[in-house]
């Protein structure tokens, strides 16, 4: 049984997009659509989660993700507490559960969890009291479900449908929790062709089993694409033996106007941020007319509002 | 039971007649999704209102959210005018407990501070749980708690009241 769903199909936690039914994903996207209006009003608040306490539990630093969760919770009128906990031996196993127990004793209603270890959010979700929901805000290489959802929301807003699209995910798929969530969501929502493009050293072995086509050549991989999703390249990958240099990477896998021209003329360019300009993406593309990178940030708030509202109120599908 | 309810279009005309003597041209009309918007659109035409008609979806303001969750199809509210110091005619199809009207007023105040709000409903069915009364009601009748009055709209725009 999926630990994220109650026996009657309601959303209990959001830990991964893997295994969530299409109806649940669509329901979250539809709900996010209705929250878009709130951000444009003078009073950017609705009282849905008034009196609820949401704890941003960040064992790994991330200013932007934490901020968007915080804004989303505040727009729902929840009380938000941010806890940035340095990763150390204190944040493993029993120590994490002690932290969770303490916060539960402070009448927490929801935990937003980011951790460098894959499975950390699942671990906490298994432990919490029945009235508490857990949202995974990124765990190790495993999943980043709200980023995956906001990417789907962006694609739907700009392309309308999923069933007729070719989507390319470019870059460090091997280490990317974002890419995993994107692939699960895209295939669940019926995208007929999902491609991953990257050097062999940055693509997981057997990635085809996730239902994607593998390309090691940008020209071939981008041809005819409707959506190009660039992934962030972590600096530490450069220090290891996986890549020769940033310049070399940009030459073969960086998105330039010339390479983007190989995709469909109306293709959109996405990036989960923050971007390494001149490494995975050229500034002309990042700031160009096909870029939807800033709308992604705006949509991220509406999507996170939808997830929190559905968890707090029950997401019957 | 259906046949015993008056024609909705006749009721809307009656409602417009009762509002007209005190209706100022600068008043804005706001309907509550879904039935209230249908009635508001008709009143808007009958009262020759100058401002566009507004629509409220009160799903984010319901007091039973934590029990029943979000309505699956929330439509965005649309208030294409400034509410500050305006006279608002708030319109709903059926007035029952008063909780929907309370939620609508809470939402309106998130858009600005109106000069006043007047409430017009097609049917006041009784069963109030809050101290809210309509300024205009085309039909007042007592309906047992287990029954519902629904306003539905056909594809051709025809409105029908039914009791179930």
From Swiss-Prot, chain A:
One GO CC term, this protein: cytosol
Classification via SUPFAM superfamilies: Aspartate/ornithine carbamoyltransferase
GO MF: amino acid binding; aspartate carbamoyltransferase activity
Pathway field: Pyrimidine metabolism; UMP biosynthesis via de novo pathway; (S)-dihydroorotate from bicarbonate: step 2/3
Catalytic activity: carbamoyl phosphate + L-aspartate = N-carbamoyl-L-aspartate + phosphate + H(+)
Primary enzyme class: transferase
Binding site residues for L-aspartate: 92, 177, 232
Cited PROSITE patterns: CARBAMOYLTRANSFERASE
Keyword Lipid metabolism: no
InterPro entries recorded: Asp/Orn_carbamoyltranf_P-bd, Asp/Orn_carbamoylTrfase, Asp/Orn_carbamoylTrfase_sf, Asp_carbamoyltransf, Asp_carbamoyltransf_Asp/Orn-bd
PANTHER family: ASPARTATE CARBAMOYLTRANSFERASE, ORNITHINE CARBAMOYLTRANSFERASE, MITOCHONDRIAL
Job of this protein: Catalyzes the condensation of carbamoyl phosphate and aspartate to form carbamoyl aspartate and inorganic phosphate, the committed step in the de novo pyrimidine nucleotide biosynthesis pathway.
Name of the molecule in the record: Aspartate carbamoyltransferase catalytic subunit
Biological source species: Thiobacillus denitrificans (strain ATCC 25259 / T1)
Protein's gene: pyrB
């Amino acid at each position: 049984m999926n630990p994220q769903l109650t026996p009657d199909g309601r959303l209990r936690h959001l830990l991964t997009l893997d295994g969530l039914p299409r109806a649940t994903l669509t329901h979250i996207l539809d709900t996010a659509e209705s929250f878009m209006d709130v951000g444009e009003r003078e009073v950017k608040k609705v009282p849905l989660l008034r009196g609820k306490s949401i704890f941003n539990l960040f064992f790994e630093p991330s200013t932007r993700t934490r901020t968007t969760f915080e804004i989303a919770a505040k727009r729902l009128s929840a009380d938000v507490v941010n806890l940035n906990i340095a990763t150390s031996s204190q944040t493993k196993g029993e120590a994490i559960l002690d932290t969770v127990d303490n916060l539960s004793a402070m009448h927490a209603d929801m935990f937003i969890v980011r951790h460098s270890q894959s499975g950390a959010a699942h671990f906490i979700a298994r432990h919490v009291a029945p009235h508490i929901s857990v949202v995974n805000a990124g765990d190790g290489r495993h999943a980043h479900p709200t980023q995956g959802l906001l990417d789907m929301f962006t694609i739907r807003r700009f392309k309308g449908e999923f069933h007729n699209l070719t989507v390319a995910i470019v870059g460090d798929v091997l280490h990317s929790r974002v890419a995993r969530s994107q692939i699960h969501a895209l295939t669940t929502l019926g995208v007929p062709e999902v491609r991953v493009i990257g050097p062999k050293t940055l693509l997981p072995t057997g990635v085809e089993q996730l239902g994607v086509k593998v390309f090691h050549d940008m020209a071939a991989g981008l041809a005819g694409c409707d959506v190009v999703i660039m992934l962030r390249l972590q600096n530490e990958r450069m220090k290891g033996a996986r890549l020769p240099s940033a310049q070399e990477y940009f030459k073969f896998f960086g998105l330039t106007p010339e390479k983007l021209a190989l995709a469909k003329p109306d293709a959109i360019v996405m990036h989960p941020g923050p971007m390494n300009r001149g490494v995975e993406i050229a500034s002309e593309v990042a700031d160009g007319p096909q870029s939807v990178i800033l709308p992604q940030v705006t949509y991220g708030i509406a999507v996170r509002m939808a997830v929190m509202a559905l968890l707090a109120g029950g997401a019957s599908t | 039971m259906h046949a015993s309810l008056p024609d909705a279009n006749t009721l809307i005309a009656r409602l417009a007649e009762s509002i007209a003597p005190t209706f100022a041209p600068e008043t804005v009309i706001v309907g509550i999704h879904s039935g209230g918007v249908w009635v508001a659109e008709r009143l808007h035409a009958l009262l020759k209102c100058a401002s566009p008609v507004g629509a409220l979806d009160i799903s984010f303001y319901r007091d039973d959210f934590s029990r029943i969750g979000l309505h699956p199809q929330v439509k965005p509210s649309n208030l294409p005018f400034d509410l500050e110091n305006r006279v608002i005619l708030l319109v709903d199809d059926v007035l029952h407990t008063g909780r929907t009207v309370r939620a609508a007023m809470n939402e309106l105040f998130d858009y600005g501070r109106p000069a006043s709000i007047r409430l017009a409903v097609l049917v006041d069915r009784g069963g109030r749980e809050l101290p809210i009364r309509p300024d205009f009601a085309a039909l007042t009748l007592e309906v047992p708690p287990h029954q519902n009055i629904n306003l539905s709209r056909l594809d051709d725009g025809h409105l029908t009241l039914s009791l179930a």
